[in-house]
């Protein structure tokens, strides 16, 4: 590949040759745009819209539209897109990922494709990683769009429904990945179409695309309500797990981040929980709690994976180092950690709706993204999202010097060398950003520097409120900043003149991350827009990456050389061995994400079917035919499943059939067994269907055509939602136990697909049965007022949590009132359970 690239250029270079002629056309229009009056800009926007309506394509108007945005930006915010930014804009418009280094002006680049694609009137979403950046970018760029006659909105998590509808109705909408995803889920839980906020998903530009589409890919967005399970079992499992002996009773697999009981551990579990066979399916609950307790006690590390704040367990994001308030581990792991640390164990929640970022973003008609580091994950972007990565050239050549890694035998020797390096450079006044992998390591390094008398600032999850302030000082003369991986993405480190003269920002990596991309992000904090700078990583053979994934060859070389603790080796062979260890981990993580996607695709297809049907019910005025079909299906299926064809059983089967239908849709004693015992199966179906349809027709007349249609809609939506929530739970339980199928020589993914699809079909049938049952029992005295439904929500795993929305109701029914559906039960024990 290397030789071919030298002859033909890299893929990015070849693609850029195709983009250059378009950029030449844009630049050639510069003079024409400068001659326009201010009021002409809005008129040009109207002209473009009219040309599109007449059949021109976006690509036809692109050069002129880009040139117009370029001039508008110059007049409103004093910034003019330079050539490389125009290239970036074209790449994004083409639905690709543009790799643009830190400080290259990604926020400004997004205005180009956003404007062009907004001309279709279908909306553009610009996605950032947090509320602060969404609002900042909207405020910075709004003058450009408004000068061109477009409306700009921003979605923040404290907005109400009307404000969200207005923001989504804008031509261009800024917001965070979690807000866009949660709004999609909530839109598919409403009972009235007027409550939906989003339009169809058209075009999305994702900033920090690697962070959202890869690091967060395994993170499901979850809207949940309070679960019913007790939390006591977590404490029992924790007590049992703490009594176990490592290696003897359980083993830890650091590569897979998991722990498993040995045969001896299984014996102990059987004695402790008083069960005969621990592996039995009926003991799945015990297995689940023990697995999570093992992981909590022996795999998850305090101040690395999570921290305790005010008696609450907060997850620490492994990629950014930020504490993620409002986010909880799923599958009971969070409760297991709470039991381990002796804080209050919260109840497990019940999932009401869920989707992964992978599947949410794949729903857009066109998707594009920007980041400083994407090339290392190019295969994943292409395979999962169908996106290719184009490296955009920098405006100024990169002047940063990237030194080779230095490798030490022990962690102690490595940290001593790091402190010596910091002291040396501090004397020269060179600013330094020191990247650590955990809160614990950043605090250890901080105390070592204090002993040496080196003043410094610390940025980790414990001090994240001061993040913007700390980063704003990081480029000053003599400033030493210790940061976990968070390192303030989205905020540039600007150098003072004295700092520039002292050599620019020095990046010191105290450990290699599992992902080369995270290392590149740290490096990329230095050398922005041609600034001077330097970087170096310090590695020890005791680091997690080297210990778990490193090759024995390096250990062999170090042993042969007989290195002392504070001696280092620096060689290409060592650097390439580190890189191959990282590639191994990246490949491993990619495979995990791919497998998870295969599982998620099963429920995703089911979600699409349910949400599509739900949307049709919301939009449709008349469900009469659909309800009649349901009634027929319920009656026919009941006959088929009750009558076996065995003559001796016939009378009993008919009695069971009549009893079954009386529970759903037949009044008592309307149909007697003797009336149908001489009929064929087909005649029985017709006779029963006729009886049931006549009853429903009478009900229609009693209640009134308009009212019954509204009741059908509300009941069907309620039943669909209830059954879908239960189905999500069932699929979750199926997935938890499916891994064991490998022991039976079964492919777990195929087993999950097969059984999941059977469960889905069963759910669809149960939706029909319950809908018919509720409709036949409903009795209404007067026209029902419309109910506004907002579900109880809690967040997934994002730092900006979704707050609970109050349930607003009109004409509220008391919990102990009789249910209006006519079942004779109290409201709380009947339809109230679904509300």
Swiss-Prot record:
What is one GO biological process annotated to this record? protein import
Q: Which GO terms describe its molecular function?
A: ATP binding; metal ion binding; protein-exporting ATPase activity
| Binding-site residues, ATP | 85, 103-107, 492
Where it sits in the cell: the answer is:
Cell membrane; Cytoplasm
Reported EC number(s) for this entry are 7.4.2.8
Lineage top rank: taxon: Bacteria
Q: Which family does it belong to?
A: Belongs to the SecA family.
Protein name, as recorded:
Protein translocase subunit SecA
